[in-house]
């Protein structure tokens, strides 16, 4: 699904990647590991079209990523989970979930039922749809973010230190939920320092700080 060929990325005088070659196949969960500064987040950002690269290429489904329109990519192909989630704090849970339903032709009642069903799936049946996101705990907010992904149903999921601010038990629960989203047509790439998380991936990619 994603092919990275001879990728080079620099920040000023510092080289992050030099002639990097990687393949990521659909149907798998990959974990990016390595010390701070090795380029895990930078690599995710480049795959997400949030960070340019200097040389080389990234192909997504056989197409040059640079030639794919960002609006189409974000709307139809990608969900990117940051440490601070992909939610709007001052909006309600319902309003955030609406962003995962863009393009779905549902009447008001069906839309509400769909949101309630997906919240139940991620263990948040007790959450009110009109509750503001900033009122939620970190674990609850992560679950809402995953609920939004379930609604959007993207072929590519990127996650950057998804559970870094959570306790071990909640981290495992969030990872378990993320793994339920795995299917043969979806690629999931997770950047993490947590051995408990990366040991559950299908494949581990170890990045090193360039000399």
Write out the residue ranges for each language-model feature.
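Conserved ABC ATPase signature
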Residues: 132-136, 140
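Helix-to-loop junction immediately C-terminal to a conserved catalytic motif
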Residues: 48
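Conserved ABC ATPase "signature" region
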Residues: 109-127
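Conserved structural motif at the start of ABC-family nucleotide-binding domains
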Residues: 2, 17-19
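Catalytic Walker B motif of ABC-type/P-loop ATPase nucleotide-binding domains
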Residues: 157-160
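Conserved ABC transporter NBD signature motif
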Residues: 56-64
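ABC ATPase NBD coupling module
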Residues: 65-79, 183
